[in-house]
Amino acid sequence: MLSSRRVVTGAGPGAVSRVASDGAARVTGMDGYPGVEIARLWSTDGGGELDSSGIERDPSLDAFYPPPGGTRFVRITYPPGFGTSDPDADASRFARLLMHRTATVDYGVMLAGELTLVLEDGSESTLRAGDVIVQNGVAHGWRNTASTTAVAVFVLVGYRS
């Protein structure tokens, strides 16, 4: 698994800024999809009040997608062949994963490799390292047709649908 060092700032006594934590982010797999890794880097649930403590909430309490006003900061690793249908595989399983719609605006940055964005109208756009995507809550899917692993970071901002 790809590790990520995560440095989190916070306010200590007297509201003086400090490093609240410095360590590895939690990385998990995705059931049924070997090679997919999700690093949950940080999350907020909105509410309008800034929590400058730098104390991480238990990520197991958070839904993957944020509520309105909430955010999720994730790094996702996509293995070669992700989102491409193996002729012997259950096609509906790939279709469910490939195309999805969320009540979020997602800001993404490709860090390594390439991913192909697939939209309902059949259009596709291939993103490479350094490219950015603003995904505005529309149905979309991802494919990695390259022979190398793709890595992207996303900030998901929750909205009412």
What is each model feature region?
Residues 3-5, 102-103:
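Short, small/polar residue-rich loop motifs at catalytic or cofactor-binding pockets
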Residues 6-12, 16-21, 27, 145-161:
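Double-stranded beta-helix
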Residues 7-8, 107, 141:
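Short, surface-exposed charged micro-motifs
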Residues 14, 39, 112, 117, ...:
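Short, electropositive, low-hydrophobicity segments enriched in small/polar residues
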Residues 20-98, 104-105, 159-160:
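A short glycine-rich, His/Asp/Glu-containing loop-to-beta-strand
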Residues 68-72, 116, 124, 128-131, ...:
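Ligand-binding loop in jelly-roll beta-barrel domains
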Residues 93-102, 107-128:
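A short beta-strand-loop-beta hairpin characteristic of the jelly-roll/cupin
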